[in-house]
UniProtKB/Swiss-Prot annotation:
Name of protein: Large ribosomal subunit protein uL23
One Gene Ontology cellular component: ribosome
Family: Belongs to the universal ribosomal protein uL23 family.
Gene Ontology biological process terms, A to Z: translation
Organism: Ralstonia pickettii (strain 12J)
Superkingdom, natural source: Bacteria
GO MF annotation list: rRNA binding; structural constituent of ribosome
Family annotation (InterPro entries): Nucleotide-bd_a/b_plait_sf, Ribosomal_uL23-like, Ribosomal_uL23/eL15/eS24_sf
Gene3D superfamilies per record: 3.30.70.330
Keywords assigned: Ribonucleoprotein, Ribosomal protein, RNA-binding, rRNA-binding
Length: 104
């Protein structure tokens, strides 16, 4: 497991949701990575520890992406969607996360 000593309560709050999109499925098939939306203050060590704790898999590496919110018009006012932080998690060979089986 990971050398990062974090309490389990914090790790349960790091992963917000898996990202299910066309790009995420292509990345999952091609590079054997899983994409998660994570907390804005999470770092790579916390994401790695959280994935290993929740899904009982071994993580090879984590890449973090900060996606800025788009500018949108709301009536006559300009607004902005929320910023999103995503984590691309590479699993070690032979490891996989199946969200369909986990949900049952």
């Amino acid at each position: 497991m990971t050398q990062v000593a974090k309490n389990d309560h914090r790790l349960m709050q790091v992963l917000l949701a898996p990202v299910v999109s066309e790009k995420a499925t292509l990345v999952a098939e091609k590079n054997e990575q899983v994409v998660f939306e994570v907390a804005r203050d999470a770092n790579k060590g916390e994401v790695k520890a959280a994935v290993e704790l929740l899904f009982k898999v071994e993580v090879e590496s984590v890449q973090i992406l900060n996606q800025k919110g788009k500018q949108k018009r709301f009536g006559r006012f300009m607004g902005r969607r929320d910023h999103v932080k995503k984590a691309y998690v590479s699993l070690k060979p032979g490891q996989e996360i199946n969200f369909e089986a986990e949900a049952k």
